[in-house]
Regions:
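Nucleotide-activated chemistry modules centered on ATP-dependent adenylation/adenylyltransferase
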Residues: 2-43, 58-226
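Short, glycine-rich nucleotide/cofactor-binding loops
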Residues: 42-51
Length: 226
């Protein structure tokens, strides 16, 4: 058979890119300047890679938006290239980056626990990548939040559909939900986990409620970048 990643790649030739760009442009027109002069009007989840640079360039330089960037650190040593890339995206486009640096003690315990029990050593950080930007978008009142590619859809995985909304990215199979009971124990208590980290455990009910209260949230759908 043919893998899902190859099928999805072939389907790209059927995409009306002009129509998709107009759809994206309409979202930008809707939210541009929504928080007043100098206020952030959109947000981007960034790592410093190819998706991050393209999205920020598109929003800032082409669409003349004022994005705020959210990033999650993993407490691992970064390569010089990685350090440069993250710095470059802020310096070249003149954007503020707010980073979440997880509790190192809790991360060590949870990485070992989830590796031994589920074979998912980076689950704790992966989950934060898909929850922290949503949480911060609610705080900054920026309902237009852009993520990069759905790795499960693009490269093969359990998700066989294109995720239209940034809120659905968490369903791509990379960081499935676990109950809070799986996070605490072995020396890790709820007090060891910040509110943002604790939200990585439950089913994000509280977080989704906060997002749905944002002004003019577009039916829980985020813009797709062309």
């Amino acid at each position: 058979g043919v893998c899902s990643a190859c099928r999805h790649y072939e389907n790209r030739k059927n995409v009306d890119w002009d129509a998709r760009f107009k759809e994206f442009e309409a979202y930008c027109n809707k939210y541009r300047g929504m928080n007043g002069p100098g206020g952030y009007d959109c947000a981007v989840a960034v790592s410093g890679g190819k998706d991050s640079h393209f999205q920020v360039w598109m929003l800032k330089e082409v669409m003349h938006m004022n994005p705020i960037l959210f990033s999650v650190e993993d407490n691992f040593p970064m390569t010089q290239a990685g350090i440069h890339n993250l710095k470059n995206i802020s310096e070249e486009f003149g954007c503020t980056i707010i980073s979440c640096k997880p509790n190192i003690r809790a991360q060590k315990v949870l990485m070992r626990k989830f590796f031994e029990k589920y074979g998912k050593p980076t689950w704790y950080v992966d989950r934060l990548i898909y929850t922290f930007p949503l949480h911060m978008a609610a705080k900054f009142n920026t309902p237009m939040l852009c993520y990069g590619e759905n790795v499960s859809f693009e490269y093969g995985g359990c998700s066989d559909k294109e995720t239209y909304s940034a809120m659905d990215q968490i369903e791509n199979g990379v960081a499935v939900g676990f109950p809070m009971e799986e996070l605490v124990g072995d020396g890790v208590t709820e007090n060891d986990l910040s509110r943002r980290a604790r939200e990585a455990g439950p089913v994000l009910y509280e977080l989704l409620c906060a997002l749905e209260q944002l002004q003019e949230l577009p039916d829980r759908q985020g813009a797709r970048l062309p």
